[in-house]
Structures are given as C-alpha cells and as structure tokens.
Amino acid sequence: VAADSAIILVGDDPAALQVAIAPVRKRLSRRGWSCKANAPFLAVFAPSGGRLDVTGALDGHGVLVGEIFDGAGAALAPEARGVLGCRPLDEARARAVCSDYWGRYLLIRRSAGEVAILRDPSGAVDCVVWRRGGVTFVATGADDVIDPWLPESSGIDWGEVAALIRRPGEHRHRLPLTDLTPVAAGELRTIGKAGGHSQQIWRPADVYRRRDANEPPDLKAAVVLAVRALAGSRRWVAELSGGLDSAIVAAALSIDQRAKVAAWVNHYVDHREGDERDYARAVARHHGVVLTEVRREGLRLNAQRLEAGADAFRPASNDIDPDYNDDIAERIGALEAWGSLTGQGGDAVFFQMPTLLVGLDEIWERRLGARVEVLHRMSRWLRRPLWLTALARDWREEVRHRAGWTHPWLEDLKSVPPAKALQVSALAFCQTFQGPAIRSRRGACVNPLLSQPVMEAGLALSSVDLTWGGRDRAAARAAFADDVPSLILDRRSKGELGAYYGQAVAHRLPFLREFLLGGALAQAGLIDPALDARLTRDHLLWRGGHSELLSLAQTEAWVRRWRDRLGRRRV
C-alpha cells in the first residue's frame, strides 16, 4: 500500500454514500485502512499508517488531503486547513489557492450536484476521479482494495497502451484504463451528475509569461524555503547521488534537519562512469555527515517483482530501477524514516539540457538587442556553430518530439521561446518522478526541486540566465556557490549508468524474451515483430535499448495485473 494512498467518496446524498461504503467497510479494515474523515456527504479512507494528512472542512462539505504551506513556508494549522475546505471552489478561488499556498495536496469541495477537485501544481499527490452509483470517487493511489468501487464498465484502453509502447518511459497523462479521469497537476476538475469540466489553473507557460524581467526571482531562497518546509522535523532517508541537484537539497536543509536524516545514501557500480562516491563523499564531509555507500550488483528483474510495482493507474515508470527502489524502501522501514528525500527534477528546473535553442531564446527575447557574447558562449559550450539553419533544425526536432505528448501543460505554449518550451516539456516529463514506486509504499518520496516555489523560480528565469556563460545549471551553481563543495560545482560531467544497466538487462534476457514475446502485449498484437532480433546480448551492449526493454516489461506486468484485477472484480 502506497504511503500516499487515500480514497475520497462524495455522495450526491447521504444514502448513496452509505450504500457505497457498507459492503466494502470490512474489506478496508482487513487491509489496514481506516476512516480518516466522515460527514453525511463525504468520507475519506486511507491506510492507518499512511503519510497523508486529512482535514475535513468545518462544515462537512469539503476536505484537504496532504500538506499545504503559506508563502513563507509555514504549514497551515488544523483550523486554517479546515477553513480552507469550507469555501466554494470555483476558478477564482482555485487561482487564489495556487497563488497564496503551495504544497503536496488535493483540495476537494462539494456543492449542489457536483464536486470540485484541485490538484496542487507540483503533482506530488496523484489524483484520479470517476463516478459510480451516485458517488464521486477521488483516488490518490490504485491499491486493489478499491476494486469494488471501480466503474463496472472500466477496462484496459488498448489504444493508450499502444501509445505507451510507442514512447516507452515517458510520462503520459492519459490513463490506459477506461472510464477513469486523471486530474493534472494544477488542474481544477469539476464532476457531477451532469458530467464534468476542467480548467487548467496553473501551467508552467503562464509562469513564464507573467514573469517580471526586471525583478528576477531569488532562486536560492525558493529552494531553501521549499526544502526546509517539506523536510520539516521529520526523519528521512536522503539521496546523495554525487550530482549537483542532490547536493543542493542537502545544502538547503538546516543544520537541525540534516541531523535528523537517518541515512545519506549513495548507490554506485563498478564502472568508473557510474561510481560517483568521490563527489558524494565531498558533500558528506562538507556537512559532517556519514555517507552510506551501496554497491549495485545487477537488477532484480522477474515477474513477481514487476507485478509488485503494477498496482498503479499507469505503468510505474518511477519504479524502473527495482534494486534502487527496494533498497530505499528497506531503509525507510528499518530506520523508521518518514520517507525519502531526493534531488529529482533539478535537471529540468535548473536547466541541464545542452541545446542551441538557448541561443534562439536570446534572439527571441531581446530581438535586435541580442548579445553576441551569449551566442558565442552557447556555441563554445556545445561545440556547434550557431547557424540559423542549425537553430531551425533543433527547434523543429523539439516540436516534433513533444507532438505526441498529452500533458495539459504543453497545450498552450504561445509566446514561449523554444528553450523555455523545452524546459516545460522536461518538467512535464518529471511528473514521472512524482509517480508511485516501491519505495513510496514505505514512506513518501519527496522531490523538493519539483515543488511549486522552485518550479516557478526556474520558469521565471530565462534559459539564458539559467545557463549563463554557457554552463548547464549555471544560476543554481552560482546561487549555492558557498554551500556546495567546489568539486561538485566545477564538475562538467554527469554519472552514466547506461553500460551498467545494459549489462544487467543482458543477464536477464532469457526471462525478458519469455515474458514479452509470450505475454499479454504480444497476444494483443502490440509487440513489434522486430523485438525478437533486439533481444540479444550483442544488440543490447552495442546498440542499447535497455530502457525500452525495462519499460516494455513494466507495461507487460501492468497489463497482466490489471487484466486479473478487472476480471476478479467482475466475478
């Protein structure tokens, strides 16, 4: 059961709510779920040891699920949380909430005939909605305890499964299940007897368009505020990968918060390019903490492990590295930590992507005032000539790449320059990191660099400023120059695990061949006939493709699991 699991039921009337709950109440109790909020029209159930705070509205017609902070990073008191759930949740109110508050939350409000759901802009808490028997269901996770409540008509959407296979590993907003509606990060979704409608209250492009170029945000202040608020006084397992982003998260914690970290974990492999212990050790020495070094050996890749991660509304791309996730999950449990703290998302929000499009942004934003030195530095950084033909080619390639994406954040990029649009695409992809994984069953997986304050700071800065001087994440490096060891700041390479994963997957080819070529996807005609030729050690080690195979295996396990779940539900 995911630590962030909960299901909210809102009845059209009290009788409909009780009819829905009564036959499932014992099932919930046997599985360790309990009622967290109860009112005539509304009920919330979650695992007894779950990590989501649940506060019912004072009038009984709304609920706040998760944690929420004000602009100064202070958590709202229970009374204020209860008041927040009392107010009507229309577009104006939703915009005010997203402007005044941030966090990891869902805000739900019932009114006559419909239910309004606001999902926070970070997307840290999942949200899927549906209707059945006069009740609106809002789920943050897909544990099979909820199966009796799923729509009777719900089934596998093979068209969406095919889309997942065409673009393996990428976050896809639409669900491969019918009659279930995903709510995007920053979306206000209203659903009721007469149907529903949606408004995207927060989107990255709007943050960029509203920016004040004369008053750039304080990137460091935004990071420190978010990291410290989300960490709170809890006990954590923290990632120290050896990269810049996890080093920044470590630096942003207060001294007292660092003292509460139960383990600073670095995973390494016996390949030079995948061994970042020297960098992680430098961060640990800088803060006077002990580094836990975990040597990686192969991948635990079998049907049982893949199925363990398949209880999600989508194939769990965030669980693509089973050994990493299993190790963190075990440490959370053994050390009685609240969850894991990571640097995920920093590449997108701080702009790590090497691209000529940054030069095009300089021209786009400054027109005739474009600075020649900026263009020269970009060309030198990328070792490519900054010809207009090259810029146009890269721009066309980026537009083509995101054309098949379905995320609402990408639906309106008008007046957003090319490199900034690339950043928005990267942030949409990073919703993968907010998704479920085995480690999130033991405790919340918190990614502070994907929080609303940090995303807004990164989006409000131009791509030129973020990469000033022709350096990836230059603004972040400058902001934390006094807090991160120079060994990290001056580093120009990134850890590379491709060779390790390639060899690890190659060792599991006999299993993958049987699992994929004789599985549900093959039966549905969705496996490329050429896959057989790619399932060889030579092809994998010399031409790559391990990520595609792992994603295919996850999708296969997901289809098998949901086929069984839906079949049992109908018996």
Each predicted region: which residue ranges?
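Short, well-ordered alpha-helical scaffold segment located
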Residues: 142-144, 454, 511, 557
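ATP-dependent adenylate-handling active sites, centered on carboxylate activation for C-N bond formation
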Residues: 13-16, 113-116, 121-127, 131-132, ...
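Short coil/turn segments at secondary-structure boundaries
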Residues: 174-184, 230, 236, 390, ...
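PAPS-dependent sulfotransferase catalytic core
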Residues: 354, 486-542
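Structural motif
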Residues: 92, 96, 152-156, 410-422, ...
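Short, hydrophobic/amphipathic alpha-helical patches that form generic packing surfaces
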Residues: 160-170, 327, 421-436, 547-564
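Long, Lys/Arg- and hydrophobic-enriched amphipathic alpha-helices
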Residues: 316-325, 529, 533-535, 543, ...
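Cysteine-centered catalytic environments shared across enzyme families
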Residues: 1-299, 306
